């Protein structure tokens, strides 16, 4: 896919969607000198979706993120684009219908290179009532979202269920139901939404922290931002500011010095990652727990297992998993596995935070996953709550509210028809895998790996190796990835630090037992020429990354949130000028 919107050649020689060092410098200059229609705060999937929605309506958009794209909730989900089967029990039919429609849209049109169908087994444990009860729920699930490109449910005997999942205890089920949902690399998807927004003209910049809201009388007219890398400060003027910061919603709202229309309650969810051979199964699984459900999701050569659902009132940027969280996950899945998992089986662990709309319930698992849009003060729109899957609808609703402050007639949302970068041409390239592999001297499985991460942008990735063939070799201690992917991460995907690359552009930090430590220096050497790192810079980046991993691993042996949080907080920040938390000035 080529860029449709580009600046004059004298001003720009790289694609508008390429978030590299040159674009980052140019964005800073534009922020301080131009008037924008919409300023979006937050580089998660909802903020990126807001930027895309506004840009494709013809608005002039700035998107700022204090850390990295998808560095919060949007890289730490259960990796599913799903309707939320469990929400049917809470009678949230509208939410499930909306999410299923969005799932189908992304699977077939918007992001087929990123969102993939995934068969699930729902093991049945009660002989009389459970099968008709669950079958009715899944039947409703199959029908609610309209057209479907995945198969309908299939009922299985115990023997049939065990053929799909031989790793289950025979005594753990009496039968099962197979149904379909989808899986997605959430961080890559969010990044692609943001880059698609840039493709259509949005000015996107990471490491750009909002430290104040600009006011003119009773109206918000922009933001003051601080560069999280060097501490430089500038101001961005906009007709309207959209607060799409997820778990930081209340913090940004406080900058307005006005009471918000809703509050966000933060819930922590923990997942563990184990090698694929530790659980023998051809399908994903969903297990009922006392409070919610537990997912076992295939993820390349691994399984992702989770999640927990507990209140979190500590560091929002670096939520910590505890030994108690991990023990709970292992104990839950071991009730059904023929060969129990142990801590020694775990290659990776991650904790994420859910921004839930605060309610009367003390149980976060019962709080609504619906979203809300509010205008707490003129010129400021806030969007919070919701599910990852419904990001596009959330973004459209937020921009619908924002356009009231734009002094021009604005077109309605069209993102239902706008494929993400890499989608156009993906299916044709899938049919040409052997040809592309022969052309590049790569194994076909490598080409398929790249297509399922970059889609039709694969040519841009491989072009970086044209004059440096060594970039097509695997990263030595993370052979699932090629060196060229690291180079592309800093050339076109906005990565500024090793953590950005190893935890989000790639998923080395959860897929390898060393969590990226063993390959940090090799990757630093690959990206240093693009980022202008000196030998001293490389040493500092590697040391910072290693210290953060060490603190994270140690925190996962702690018995409670407070002690785990203290350990994580003891590690240095890669973004040395970040302010946490932002306070009123």
From Swiss-Prot:
Which cofactor(s) does the record list?
A: FAD
Pfam families in UniProt: DAO, DAO_C
Can you say where in the cell this protein is located? Cytoplasm
What does the record give as EC number?
1.1.5.3
This entry carries the following GO cellular component terms, namely:
cytoplasm
Record's InterPro entries?
A: DAO_C, DAO_C_sf, FAD-dep_OxRdtase, FAD/NAD-bd_sf, G3P_DH_FAD-dep
User: Which cysteines link up through disulfide bonds?
Assistant: none
Task: Give me the residues that bind FAD, please.
Answer: 37-65
Q: Which residues cross the membrane?
A: none
Catalysed reactions, semicolon-separated? a quinone + sn-glycerol 3-phosphate = dihydroxyacetone phosphate + a quinol
* Keywords recorded for this protein, A-Z: Cytoplasm, FAD, Flavoprotein, Glycerol metabolism, Oxidoreductase
> Source organism's superkingdom?
Bacteria
Q: What GO biological process, any one, is recorded here? A: glycerol-3-phosphate catabolic process
In Gene Ontology terms, what is one molecular function of this protein?
glycerol-3-phosphate dehydrogenase (quinone) activity
Q: Which family does it belong to?
A: Belongs to the FAD-dependent glycerol-3-phosphate dehydrogenase family.
* Protein name stated in the entry: Glycerol-3-phosphate dehydrogenase
Identify the gene encoding this protein: glpD
């Amino acid at each position: 896919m080529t860029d449709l919107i580009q600046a004059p050649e004298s001003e720009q020689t790289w694609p508008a969607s390429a978030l590299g060092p040159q674009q980052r410098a140019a964005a800073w200059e534009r922020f301080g000198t131009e008037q924008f229609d919409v300023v979006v705060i937050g580089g998660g999937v909802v903020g990126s979706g807001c930027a895309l929605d506004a840009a494709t309506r013809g608005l002039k958009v700035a998107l700022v993120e204090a850390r990295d794209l998808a560095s919060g909730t949007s890289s730490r989900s259960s990796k599913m684009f799903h309707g939320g089967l469990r929400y049917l029990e809470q009678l949230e039919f509208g939410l499930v219908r909306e999410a299923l429609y969005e799932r189908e849209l992304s699977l077939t049109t918007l992001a087929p290179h990123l969102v993939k169908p995934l068969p699930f087994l729902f093991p049945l444990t009660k002989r009389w009532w459970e099968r008709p009860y669950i079958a009715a729920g899944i039947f409703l699930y199959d029908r609610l979202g309209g057209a479907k490109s995945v198969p309908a449910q299939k009922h299985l005997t115990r023997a049939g269920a065990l053929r799909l999942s031989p790793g289950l205890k025979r005594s753990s089920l009496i039968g099962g139901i197979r149904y379909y949902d989808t899986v997605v690399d959430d961080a890559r998807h969010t990044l692609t939404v943001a880059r698609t927004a840039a493709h259509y003209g949005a000015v996107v910049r990471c490491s750009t922290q909002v430290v104040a809201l600009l006011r003119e009388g009773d109206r918000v007219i922009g933001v003051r931002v601080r560069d999280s890398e060097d501490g430089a400060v500038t101001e961005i003027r906009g007709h309207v500011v959209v607060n799409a910061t997820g778990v930081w919603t209340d913090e940004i709202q406080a900058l307005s010095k006005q009471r918000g229309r809703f509050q966000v309650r933060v819930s922590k969810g923990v997942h563990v990652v184990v090698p694929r051979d530790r659980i023998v199964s051809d399908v994903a699984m969903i297990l009922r727990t006392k409070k919610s459900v537990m997912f076992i999701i295939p993820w390349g050569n691994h399984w992702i297992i989770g999640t927990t659902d507990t209140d979190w009132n500590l560091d929002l940027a670096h939520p910590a998993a505890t030994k108690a969280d991990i023990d709970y996950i292992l104990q839950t899945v071991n009730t059904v596995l023929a060969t129990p998992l142990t801590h020694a089986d775990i290659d990776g662990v991650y904790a994420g935070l859910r921004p839930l709309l605060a309610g009367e319930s003390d149980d976060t698992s019962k709080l609504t996953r619906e979203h809300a849009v509010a205008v707490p003060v003129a010129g400021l729109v806030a969007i919070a709550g919701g599910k990852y899957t419904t990001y596009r609808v959330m973004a459209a609703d937020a921009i619908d509210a924002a356009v009231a402050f734009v002094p021009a007639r604005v077109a309605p949302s069209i993102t239902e028809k706008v494929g993400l970068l890499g989608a156009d041409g993906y299916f044709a390239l899938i049919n040409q895998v052997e040809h592309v592999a022969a052309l590049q001297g790569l194994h076909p499985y490598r080409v398929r790996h790249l297509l399922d991460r970059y889609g039709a942008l694969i040519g841009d990735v491989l072009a970086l190796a044209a004059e440096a063939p060594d970039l097509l070799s695997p990263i030595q201690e993370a052979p699932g990835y090629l060196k060229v992917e690291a180079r592309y991460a800093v050339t076109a995907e906005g990565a500024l630090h090793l953590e950005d690359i190893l935890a989000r552009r790639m998923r080395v930090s959860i897929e390898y037992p060393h969590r990226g430590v063993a390959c940090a220096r090799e990757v630093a050497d690959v990206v240093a020429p693009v980022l202008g790192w000196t030998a001293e810079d490389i040493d500092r980046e590697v040391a910072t990354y290693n210290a953060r991993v060490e603190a994270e691993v140690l925190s996962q042996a702690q018995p409670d949130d407070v002690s785990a949080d203290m350990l994580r907080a003891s590690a240095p920040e890669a973004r040395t000028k970040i302010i946490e938390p932002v306070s009123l000035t």
